[in-house]
């Protein structure tokens, strides 16, 4: 059985958020780097750096904190398409999360991108996850 790297990323971020940790360590793969890059660009995480340990690479992500409190922002991360049930969407039927406040991460023929980028380019793909 294969591993679901997207679910591992989302679960580790969710667990670190619930445990009030400031950083998350994620195994580095091409898919993980693309998803974390989108999360960084959209402002769901503050900082990312690549760390090497015993010839293995890890992405160390810093979660975004509130200015006046010590806790992190509560992000809801939901896996949609999974290995047992793939969900695809064309660009006209890509769902809008909270009226555009959240993002949908898609795997397209041109790489991993957000719902806004996919609509602008007019391409659909596999709906990986929702984040709001």
Curated annotation (Swiss-Prot):
Compartment annotation: Plastid, Chloroplast
Entry-linked Pfam families: Ribosomal_S8 (PF00410)
PROSITE patterns given in the database record: RIBOSOMAL_S8
Single GO biological process annotation from the record: translation
Keyword annotations of the record: Chloroplast, Plastid, Ribonucleoprotein, Ribosomal protein, RNA-binding, rRNA-binding
Source domain of life: Eukaryota
MF annotations from Gene Ontology: rRNA binding; structural constituent of ribosome
InterPro entries: Ribosomal_uS8 (IPR000630), Ribosomal_uS8_CS (IPR047863), Ribosomal_uS8_sf (IPR035987)
GO cellular component: chloroplast; ribonucleoprotein complex; ribosome
Family: Belongs to the universal ribosomal protein uS8 family.
Subunit structure, interactors included: Part of the 30S ribosomal subunit.
Function: One of the primary rRNA binding proteins, it binds directly to 16S rRNA central domain where it helps coordinate assembly of the platform of the 30S subunit.
Protein name (Swiss-Prot/TrEMBL): Small ribosomal subunit protein uS8c
Source organism: Liriodendron tulipifera
Organism placement in taxonomy: Eukaryota, Viridiplantae, Streptophyta, Embryophyta, Tracheophyta
Gene it is expressed from: rps8
